Amino acid sequence: PALIAAGLMGLALLATGSRTPLVATTLACAWLIIACWNKRSAWLLVCGVLVTLAVVRLYPEILLERGLSYRPELWAQTLSKVAQQPWQGFGLDAQLAILIADLNTSFSEPHNFALGVLYYTGIIGLAIWLAMHALALFQCWKHRSNYLFIVAGALLVYGIGAGLTEGGGILPRPKEHWLVTWIPLALIAALSIRTRQTQGALR
């Protein structure tokens, strides 16, 4: 049943034609395989690699048809703006406008979570942001015997994958991106606190 459900989910993802959830789901599955490593995980890893190669071979247009969707241009312009105030950023209430001349359209997000954090809070804020994620993943790995940490880690890894090519304005106000950023971090923090309290009560 689990394999059937996974297959249906994979087909649904392919049907959307969106590459971001494909990348994010692949990374989340990789986390689950590594965190729950056993003989079955090895077989799943092999099957996953074979399926990925088959999709790339049979349906290359899914990945290549739309090119890079102007992501490099968005990132380059964001970095050029960051260079003006690299350490402290422009502040949480700052406005970001990235003009793509070919589209005659201005974007308000860099389509990358880390670049968004860098723009608003600078290198200092980005360092804190990365440290939070590193610590959260470390806690999930450390307590991987608890399936709740494994699930929370998968949510966080999914968010990291999604944040590679989407979003950017995740700090000023609540929005849908919080479902794959702040909420997984909050869940991991809550699990860590509860685990520490439980361990302290047993001593």
Question: In which residue ranges do the predicted regions lie?
Answer:
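Hydrophobic alpha-helical segments of polytopic membrane proteins
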Residues: 1-58, 145, 187
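Membrane-embedded alpha-helical segments of multi-pass membrane proteins
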Residues: 22-30, 124-128, 175-184
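Long extracytoplasmic/lumenal interhelical loops at the membrane interface
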Residues: 58-121
